[in-house]
From Swiss-Prot:
GO terms for molecular function: small GTPase binding; tRNA binding. It is found in: Nucleus; Cytoplasm. tRNA nucleus export receptor which facilitates tRNA translocation across the nuclear pore complex. Involved in pre-tRNA splicing, probably by affecting the interaction of pre-tRNA with splicing endonuclease. Keywords: Cytoplasm, Nucleus, RNA-binding, Transport, tRNA processing, tRNA-binding. One of its GO terms (cellular component) is nuclear pore. The keyword Transport applies. The keyword Ribonucleoprotein does not apply. One of its GO terms (biological process) is tRNA re-export from nucleus. Belongs to the exportin family. This is Exportin-T. InterPro entries: ARM-like (IPR011989), ARM-type_fold (IPR016024), Exportin-1/Importin-b-like (IPR013598), Exportin-T_C (IPR045546), XPOT (IPR040017). It comes from Laccaria bicolor (strain S238N-H82 / ATCC MYA-4686).
Length: 1066
């Protein structure tokens, strides 16, 4: 055995030293085998842990002994039956001797304190295996060791054994009663039953003695602490005080660990309650925190009788205690002790929730009334915790507050009586606390703060908003008056020159910002959305008279008054960017207000454009303003006088310069071009280009001026584009010209995006934008694409820009599409396929029949490529996702073609040879139940196919682009009908799956379309050929055909679903 032990110890030493590379892995594998075979190796482990040398010291190093405990853990942890007698005796004697030598007379592993915690866990596992049948005297034996035999000792109890006892009880509580620990490991019925038996046995045999021992040691430790505090000059020094604090701390933790699973009459007594309250106010923070947890567990302990629970809470009188402690700690504000106030808040929260359970669940009216009174009594202290400057403390009472407000809302719904004064007073006080908590700290700096800090503040504001919304549902006037008063008082004070702190100003503006949200119900009552939210206009204004109506004649709503005061106050000039940013956020959110108070537009625009906004020195601030300015202009464009749009553009020209910097490569695995393209500042700048396009579009009634303005925006970009293309053509590795071309193409696309879409039918008197300029832009972009089509970012930018130019110019640039497609497909990555098909779908939507020739050339190669792609095997999650996305985009494209009546491309001279292959591909996808969404879309395509090509070949039924195809009926009867009945019969077709039900409904639609298009012929086929071949009884077949012919779509879908469901269960 000695040789084996030495071998294990040597392996552990090697495994603890990764520098021994040659033997490291071998040693790890060896000791892993030792641990896995704990049933055979536990004796070796026991010796390694307890053996001593001739001098009485532990024989083996600490890391070896720690590993030995892990082996013993493995041996005990998987054992749910008693040990054999010989094994039990060997372990019992060894561990008892170890405790005697190390804890009773020794230093309790002073040189390796981590072994203490590990040993207490191992001993606990041994206890769980043996307590019921083999070591029932476990606690009795332990208690005899706690009191030292030497009467000269200053302490009555052995400190080491006391702490070991505490740790063991804590471990036992964790193993047999802690639901968090239990839920964290896989359920094991044998373990669950064993733990329940141990828990019951401890309750019956030793619970009272354990509790008495814990409290006795705690009381002695507390007395010792008090004596040491009195004699601060004692030579015993702080070490003894530290030791006493540790004992009391662990003792109270132990007490708190078992109060939830032993008799409450043991833990809540005339002795324990005063002790706990004394310790709750102790000078030691760890003791106070441990005591608060113990009290929390007492309060939350479940009792069968509501009366008993109420009596428990009355005995504790926690409300009064917490009131006093909250006031005391708030006055002291001791640094680093905020965790104590947080613990007190949690305790109050649980107390309130337990009382609320009595109010909600108890049938005894007296108990409910008394519990409700107690909740009312603790509301003031709850509000004081809510007002705490630390968010962690404030949020401890959120669940209780939510419960109280939910109760108020519930009563409000069932009663039309006014809210009683006490509740209204509480809500008014709460409202003031909430508004104060929504404010930034004065010394905070949102601009320089960590993103996580700002996110936490925003999260807190949102949570406070939910409470505000709850009060709103209870007493709307109370909330709106409070918010309005605080916002207007702050704004007015600033306007009048009163010195306002930045955080007060920001809150005032923020309240105007959220008023539209918290006041939704009032705006609905007043007439709803839009202008009606800001002025008291008639509920109905004749549609023809709306444009001529002067809404400024109508009085403002409350929100309208707040916004008017906000604009007129000049708060946009507040010398703190957080305040001015909040102003701009508010202005851009409520643009409908500016439609009724047009005199507010110019001052707001001025603030947005000058150094308060777009031209602010702070880069991040400017970036956000680019978006807000764009939003304001876009939503208010019809209210902006066209004659000032040129001035606005001129004032922002310096911001339209495109500057490119190539970042230094930090990671060789990242594509440097993609990294250079990613630029959040440029992404924000694109909003300005679109805004410039919007402002230029406003000059539509003066075409010459509009052309000049558009040219002044586009020409510098086109010149820059030419210079960058020439630089690229010279060769070299410089990424700058490529990035510059990308950015310019994106900018040109965004300018086009600012113009309205080309009309489907041009109305009389409509003035088109300068199409010739956009044509030149399209040509220039194509030249760049042809030269740079090997670069994906250039292809992406071109696709975007062309989509926007086509939306603006309509068929004007259609002639460039073949060249565009050729260059986009010249170099193609699989990831671009979905974007490309979506792009084609957009062109179809915009250009309709003008896309026929392009699609005629494109659809054949594209279908062949995708069909090949979809038949390839898939490996990996990412590849599977890409496969599905490609399939869905392809099916969407095909359906777009059919919906736009461009179906002729599938049967054209160029593509007719592939038509049957396409139909077979669609049929396969329609039968693939592994992807119901794609399956449904494929059936939709087949549905449309029947409508177009399945018509009887007669001149009266023909149509120019969708006449029937001779022979298509064979495909319908031989293939599609089979599919309609094969799919629902597949074993994988799950009728309980909502997506599968959608597929089934689409199949029902297809059956009806077939019969509608083919008429009597189809009915004869079903009744005479298909259904008999499927062995349908003639009555069932006749019923099916009758329903298919006579029911509407909804009725037949319901019938067909029930038919399939019954056929699968029969």
């Amino acid at each position: 055995m000695e040789q084996e032990i030495d071998q294990i110890v040597q392996a552990i030493t090697i495994a603890s030293d990764p520098t021994q590379a040659s033997l490291y892995q071998q040693a790890l594998a060896y000791i892993s085998t030792i641990q896995q075979n704990a049933n055979e190796t536990w004796r070796l482990a026991l010796h390694i842990f307890v053996d001593q040398n001739t001098e009485g010291h532990r024989k083996h190093p600490a890391q070896a002994r720690f590993f030995a405990l892990r082996v013993l853990d493995e041996f005990f942890d998987n054992r749910f039956e008693p040990l054999d007698h010989e094994s039990f005796q060997a372990i019992h004697q060894a561990l008892t001797a170890y405790i005697q030598s190390e804890y009773v007379v020794g230093s309790a592993e002073a040189d390796a304190s981590f072994l203490r915690n590990k040993f207490s866990h191992t001993l606990t596992l041994f206890f769980l295996c043996t307590y019921i049948d083999q070591w029932p005297s476990f606690f009795t034996d332990l208690f005899t060791l706690i009191r030292p035999t030497e009467s000269a000792t200053r302490s009555n109890f052995n400190r080491h054994i006391s702490l070991l006892f505490f740790h063991i009880v804590l471990e036992i509580s964790g193993e047999v009663a802690d639901q968090i620990i239990k839920s964290a490991r896989p359920y094991n019925a044998a373990r669950h039953a064993r733990d329940a038996r141990v828990r019951d046995a401890v309750r019956d045999r030793d619970a009272a003695r354990i509790n008495a021992a814990v409290l006795t040691i705690v009381v002695e430790g507390a007395e010792q602490m008090a004596n040491l505090h009195k004699s601060e000059t004692s030579s015993r020094g702080p070490r003894e005080l530290e030791g006493a604090v540790e004992v009391v701390d662990w003792g109270i933790r132990t007490f708190g660990s078992y109060v939830g699973w032993i008799d409450i009459n043991l833990t809540v007594t005339p002795t324990t309650v005063p002790l706990l309250f004394n310790l709750l106010a102790d000078s030691s923070l760890p003791i106070r925190l441990a005591t608060s947890v113990s009290l929390l567990r007492i309060v939350s302990k479940g009792l069968k009788e509501p009366g008993d629970k109420l009596q428990l809470l009355k005995v504790l009188s926690l409300g009064q205690v917490l009131d006093a402690l909250e006031a005391k700690t708030r006055a002291q504000q001791i640094e680093r002790e905020e965790s104590y106030r947080e613990a007190l808040g949690k305790l109050l929260n649980v107390l309130g929730l337990e009382l609320a359970k009595l109010v909600d669940d108890c049938s005894d009216e007296d108990i409910r009334a008394e519990a409700s009174t107690y909740i009312t009594q603790i509301q003031p202290v709850m509000l004081r915790f809510m007002a705490d400057e630390y968010d962690d403390t404030c949020s401890t009472v959120f669940p209780l507050l939510q419960n109280i407000l939910t109760t108020y809302k519930r009563h409000r719904k069932i009663s039309s009586n006014p809210l009683d004064e006490s509740k209204r007073s509480f809500l008014a006080s709460l409202l003031q606390v909430l508004l104060a908590k929504m404010k930034w700290e004065e010394d905070a700096d949102p601009e320089d703060a960590d993103e996580d800090d700002n996110a936490e503040f925003d999260k807190m504001r949102k949570e406070l908003r939910t409470f505000l919304d709850s009060i709103l549902a209870i007493d709307q006037v109370l909330v709106t008056d409070a918010v309005k008063t605080l916002a207007l008082d702050t704004i007015t004070a600033f306007k009048n020159g009163v010195s306002i702190k930045w955080n007060d100003a920001e809150l005032g503006v923020y309240l105007v910002f959220i008023f539209g949200e918290i006041n939704k119900s009032m705006t609905r009552i007043a007439g709803g959305k839009g202008r009606a939210a800001f002025c008291q206009a008639p509920a109905v204004v004749d549609k023809d008279k709306r444009k001529a109506t002067d809404y400024s004649d109508y009085p403002l709503t409350t929100h309208g008054e707040m916004l008017l005061a906000l604009v007129q106050s000049g708060v946009a000039s507040f010398p703190h960017r957080t305040v001015s940013l909040q102003f701009f956020e508010t202005a851009s959110r409520y643009t409908d207000f500016f439609k009724i108070r047009k005199d507010c537009i110019i001052p707001t625009l001025e603030a947005m454009i000058d150094t308060r906004g777009l031209h602010n020195e702070n880069l991040n601030f400017r970036s956000r303003l680019f978006y807000l300015f764009h939003r304001f202009i876009k939503e208010s464009r019809n209210e902006i006088p066209p004659h000032i749009s040129g001035n606005i553009i001129d004032s922002m020209r310096d911001l339209l310069l495109i500057e490119v910097e190539i970042p230094a490569a930090e990671d060789t695995e990242i594509d440097p071009l993609s990294e250079a393209i990613k630029n959040s500042q440029f992404d924000s700048q694109l909003y300005l280009f679109e805004t410039a396009g919007i402002l230029t579009s406003l000059l539509c009634k003066t075409p010459t001026q509009q052309t000049a303005m558009l040219l002044s925006l586009v020409k510098p970009l086109m010149d820059d584009l030419s210079v960058s293309l020439q630089a690229f053509s010279k060769g070299g590795q410089d990424l700058l010209p490529i990035v510059k071309v990308h950015h310019i193409i994106m900018a040109l696309g965004n300018i086009a995006k600012g113009f309205p879409d080309y009309p489907t039918s041009i109305p009389e008197g409509h003035i088109l934008p300068p199409l010739e300029i956009f044509t030149e832009v399209a040509q220039a972009i194509l030249v760049c694409l042809e030269a740079m089509n090997v670069y994906k970012p250039i292809r992406d930018a071109t696709r975007f820009a062309f989509a926007r130019i086509l939306a603006t110019t309509g068929p004007t640039v259609t002639s460039y599409i073949p060249q565009l497609m050729g260059n986009l497909l010249a170099h193609f990555e699989p990831t671009e396929l979905v974007d490309f098909m979506n792009f084609i779908g957009l062109l179809i939507h915009k250009l309709q029949k003008d896309m026929f020739d392009v699609l005629d050339q494109l659809i054949g190669p594209l279908s062949a490529h995708i069909t090949s792609l979809l038949t390839q095997p898939v490996s990996g999650t990412d590849e599977h996702r890409a496969h599905i996305e490609t399939k869905r985009a392809y099916l969407a494209l095909l359906n777009n073609i059919m919906a736009s009546k461009l179906d002729g491309i599938f049967t054209s001279e160029r593509n007719s040879s592939n038509f049957e292959v396409l139909l077979e591909s669609m049929q396969r996808l329609a039968e693939d139940v592994s992807d119901p969404a794609s399956e449904k879309t494929a059936i939709m395509f087949l549905n449309r196919s029947v409508t177009v090509w399945g018509q009887p070949s007669s001149s009266e039924n023909g149509r120019e682009t969708g006449h029937g195809l001779p022979g298509f009926e064979r495909f319908i009867y031989e293939r599609l009908v089979q599919t309609c009945f094969r799919v629902p019969s597949l074993p994988q077709f799950n009728l309980k799956d909502g997506q599968m039900m959608v597929v089934l409904h689409e199949i029902a639609n297809l059956l009806q379309v077939i019969c509608k298009i083919r008429g009597h012929e189809a009915y004869n086929f079903f009744i005479s050929v298909f259904l008999p071949s499927q062995n349908w009884p003639s009555e069932t077949a006749l019923d099916f055909m009758t329903k298919l012919r006579d029911l509407d779509g909804k009725g037949f879908r319901k019938y067909f679903t029930e038919l399939i469901r019954s056929s699968r269960t029969s």
